Each structure stands twice: as C-alpha cells, then as structure tokens.
Amino acid sequence: MPKLENKKTKKEAWVVAVDMGYGHQRSAYPLRHLSPQGRVINANSYEGIPQKDRRIWEASKRFYDFISTFRRVPVIGKLAFAIFDRSQRILSFYPSRDLSKPTFQLKQNYNFIKKGWGKDLIEKLKEKPLPLITTFFTPAFMAEFYDYPEEIYCVIPDADISRSWAALNPKKSRIKYFVPNSRTAERLQLYGVSPDNIFLTGFPLPKENIGGEDMAVLKGDFKQRLANLDPQKRYYGTYGEMVKRELGELPSPSRPLTIMFAVGGAGAQKELGVEIVKNLAEKLKSGEVKIILVAGIRKEVRNYFLENLDNPEKVDIIFAKDINSYFGKFNEALRKTDILWTKPSELSFYSALGLPILVAPPI
C-alpha cells in the first residue's frame, strides 16, 4: 500500500467526502489529520461551490432522502424504492465475467462532469497539489477528468459495490482504490480495474477507539465489554486462557448492559428506536439495561425520540448540530457500548472494535 506518512516527514493529503448519508463522512473522519487544515472537504457543500454544481449535488441528495423515507408508504412507496434500488443494483458475483460495461447512471455522471461539474473544486485543489483521498467515487472521477496532477485515491466504505465506483474506462484509469475487504477488491477487478490499483486496507476506524499500535484503548474497552456480555462467565469458561493471554484478567461488570441504536443519515428507522425502548421499558426502569439512541445531526429525529418516548430522560440521545461533533460524541459513547444495533451500513465494519452488532432490516 502506498505510504502517506513516515517518521521523518509528515505528508499531507486532501481528504474529500460528500455529506450524503453518514458513510462517506464517517470513513473520512479518521483521515482528517492528513488534511492541511485538519478537516474534511465536502465536495457537495464546500465554501465557494458554484451554484450550478451545488444544484446537481442537491438534486441527488434530496432524491435519496425522499426515497428512503417514502419507502414506508404502503404499496406505492415500496414500488418506487424497488425501481430506485434496481438502478443501483449490484449484479450477482458468480459466474466470474466481464462487468466493465458502464451503467446509465455512470454515463450520466460523466456527462455532468464533461459540462463542468466539479471543475471548480479540482482547480481549487490544484492550487496546493497534494495526494487526493476521497471516500466517494464522483470526486475521484472529477479529479481524473480535470487532470489533477497528484495521486488520486478512493476509499470504499462498503462491503460490496456497484459498477458506479469504477471509472468510465477502468482499464485506463489511474485512480487507486483502498478497499475494506477481499470481496470488494475482486468486484473492482470484474469492473475492469487493474489489480495494481487495488489495495486491501480495511475500513478506516477512529483512532480514539483504538489507541496506538498496541491498541490499548480498544483492548481496555473490549475487556469491560466482555465482562458485561458474559456475566455468568460461560464464554470465559471455554476461552479464558486465550482472553487472559490477549487481554489480561477481566474486570467485574461496572455498568448496565448498554445497547446503542443508530439511525441512518436519512433518518429512516427512527420508529424502531422507540419500539426498542418501549419493549425494554421494565429492564430500563430496573437499571438492568441502558439504551443510547443515535439521532446524528438530524434534529427531527431527536425531536421524534423526545416526543414519542414515555420517559426520554431514561434514555441517552446522541445529537449534534455538526458532523464532527456528532462523530466525536458517537465514538466516545461507543467505548461504553456493549451492543450496537443498526441497519446494514458502514457501521458493520465497527465489529472490528470488538462490538457485537444486531443488524436491523435493510432499508
């Protein structure tokens, strides 16, 4: 994998995401220290973005948010979502075959780029040419089309991907991909990306939840979590020697079993959070269980929780007005979380932090 940092010289890179759902920003957040300003640039809302560029991005975002919530409308909602979902479908992995033919959606993206979409962003980045790391495919395509002079890296925050992630002509593209798993690496090759441009790195996880190279923070949190999840020591009875070798002696449980339910960026499934609280009301009342509901940066989701819970003061609600504050609060709360409950998303990779995950139905 290409190194962006060494002991002698700290190298910098532009880190670019989009604020369309949390996945692209969550995977960029741990890389923000590489940026000259220590922050992530959002390609769809950066300072000074031309109105014509903003309109293209906003049309896409509005449609995504609308279709995610409209799905709950009986019959017609599910039909509309099925049509949308089909346009983004990931073709079956087997049999192995050439899947490099570009989709209509990808061609449409490039048509906008050829008409000037993204040129302003790339010209601004050219003023201080640094390696470009983006967690969304469109800025990578823009950079390549407008001859960005430095390396272009695309971080993939998904366990499997559609053809949209590979360039129009993938065999000639110089975009390099950082992928979270071997399936995604193989998928890119089916789409025509050269194996030389694919690097299996895993998903970027927050440093504050890991610690240094010794992973002291992660191991300490995992020890406490394991004690909470195994109060009768059944797991420890079987794997105790391995636990002691890797983590040391387990502490006694020091908190109620803590469940975090995370709502997606579009605000869908907030009703499930309220249902969870109501079903565990007795255990909440007795102090046996603690629940954390994650509203993210969606004020309407926080308000929904407050208005629909009988005793909202018994529940912790994570909400922030800006994305960085939200990620900070979320990562801090994760350290004292025993079970993460969420829909299939980038948070699935957080199992690597030693977090068991309950998977809600996909949207």
Regions found by a protein language model. Name each.
Residues 22, 27, 33, 79-207:
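Active-site and donor-binding regions of nucleotide-sugar-utilizing enzymes
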Residues 29-120, 296-301, 308, 312-315, ...:
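Conserved N-terminal ligand/cofactor-binding loop architecture of enzyme catalytic domains
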